[in-house]
Amino acid sequence: MGLPWYRVHTVVLNDPGRLIAVHLMHTALVAGWAGSMALYEIAVFDPSDPVLNPMWRQGMFVLPFMVRLGITNSWGGWTINGENVTDPGFWSFEGVAAAHIGLSGLLFLAAIWHWVYWDLELFRDPRTGEPALDLPKMFGIHLFLSGLLCFGFGAFHLTGLFGPGMWVSDAYSITGRVQPVAPAWGPEGFNPFNPGGVVSHHIAAGIVGILAGLFHLSVRPPQRLYKALRMGNIETVLSSSISAVFFAAFIVAGTMWYGSAATPVELFGPTRYQWDQEYFHQEMERRVQKDVAAGASLSEAWNRIPAKLAFYDYIGNNPAKGGLFRAGPMNKGDGIAESWLGHATFKDKEGRELTVRRMPTFFETFPVVLIDKDGVLRADIPFRRAESKYSIEQMGVTVSFYGGKLDGQTFTDAPTVKKYARKAQLGEAFEFDRETLKSDGVFRSSARGWFTFGHASFALIFFFGHLWHGGRTLFRDVFAGIGEEVTEQVEFGAFQKVGDKTTRKQEAG
């Protein structure tokens, strides 16, 4: 046929059997990739420390999606929470992976069958014997089935009626676990961070889909609408399908990047806005102040802070810090976190408590500046020591640690104080193992960043694909060089005498 590479799909344009075959093969590839990728991730995943070495630090991509849907156990005897399990059941990580690979094989065989047996009676109009597809009817069937699936997922899987539920956590992502979720039918259901909204929206959207599907199965489209939207053209189906996909891709890119109940921090890592707004830092300060007010010492108060919460307040876990072209997981950047050193508090020689100005997201380097409670500069690490006025040495700055590995220790020598000031600029201080993975010290992004970038990019490409195929189907006659006038002249039944405009038939009024 001699088609260029970008036009090869023309061969299935008027061949429903082989169109089904290529879609089956595509689904087989997707399911096979998902299962294979899951097995690979399970093989390289280290479940030993879910607090300081969680899945999102290790670059896991499909694992978080499995966990949020209720899969937490492995046939290897471990769980996502770092515990041991004796009976993981079939629906473990490996079980789901095997099911996908098995499904992939069946779809592969189905694709081959449909490619060989392409000319089925099903694709022919029983009245004329000509190849024909009833696209509005097919639309109704697909809408009904997808509505049924959507409703079933919300009403059974998520509610725990017949399924595990979904991943639910507190506002600071400390106590996350899989549990059944009740639907939220009030205004609170529109809060993107409320898991109940996910349930109610699936149930509601499913009901709408079922009703809409039944409507389209029982009501034929008006002739004018059918013609205006080119409902008889398979490229219309392609165009509208692409629009549904790019719209969904834009939505999930947003919910992933800005955060939502469906993209929990424990599974995908923090968002950049939680660093920008000092979300976790403020919560730690609130907890400490509350404990101190209740009579606890600073050391006791900071020791009650979970290491998990402290680790979220570290810039290396900010997905916007990793460049898009820096390959590898976060652990390949700053290393594998081993321990929290504690909360660093700085003081100058006059006894003023100082805090290090935190590095903004989009800076690779930033001056180390120590300010007092009023925001006044009191000390820094100067660029040019000869002209310095506020150096650590000149201001007699010391650092004390509360909580963590260095709890109760105070350092007064300038080089050590500077070291911890540089660490404090990046949030809470942690000790990292950079040897095991040969980590290079350059920050990487989490799965949150990769997912967002990928889906936003493909959504944009698919948007243009929608315009392209929509334009082709709407203006097919123009692109083919056949004007409306010519079409009318040769169309059977438009005139009493073919091509004679003076014999136009009157439409039935």
Swiss-Prot record:
Q: Where in the cell is it found?
A: Plastid, Cyanelle thylakoid membrane
Q: Which Gene3D superfamilies match?
A: Photosystem II CP47 reaction center protein
Keywords assigned: Chlorophyll, Chromophore, Cyanelle, Membrane, Photosynthesis, Photosystem II, Plastid, Thylakoid, Transmembrane, Transmembrane helix
**Which parts pass through the membrane?**
21-36, 101-115, 140-156, 203-218, 237-252, 457-472
Q: How is the co-factor bound, per the entry?
A: Binds multiple chlorophylls. PSII binds additional chlorophylls, carotenoids and specific lipids.
- Pfam families, from UniProt? PSII (PF00421)
**What is one process in the GO biological process aspect for this record?**
photosynthetic electron transport in photosystem II
Bilayer topology: Multi-pass membrane protein
InterPro entries according to UniProt: PS_antenna-like (IPR000932), PS_II_antenna-like_sf (IPR036001), PSII_PsbB (IPR017486)
A GO cellular component term found in this entry reads: cyanelle thylakoid membrane
What GO annotations for molecular function exist for this entry? chlorophyll binding; electron transporter, transferring electrons within the cyclic electron transport pathway of photosynthesis activity
Query: Does Cell inner membrane show up as a keyword for this record?
Result: no
Give the similarity note. Answer: Belongs to the PsbB/PsbC family. PsbB subfamily.
Q: Which HAMAP family match?
A: PSII_PsbB_CP47 (MF_01495)
Q: What is said about its interaction partners and assembly?
A: PSII is composed of 1 copy each of membrane proteins PsbA, PsbB, PsbC, PsbD, PsbE, PsbF, PsbH, PsbI, PsbJ, PsbK, PsbL, PsbM, PsbT, PsbX, PsbY, PsbZ, Psb30/Ycf12, at least 3 peripheral proteins of the oxygen-evolving complex and a large number of cofactors. It forms dimeric complexes.
Q: What does the UniProt record say this protein does? A: One of the components of the core complex of photosystem II (PSII). It binds chlorophyll and helps catalyze the primary light-induced photochemical processes of PSII. PSII is a light-driven water:plastoquinone oxidoreductase, using light energy to abstract electrons from H(2)O, generating O(2) and a proton gradient subsequently used for ATP formation.
Protein name (database record): Photosystem II CP47 reaction center protein
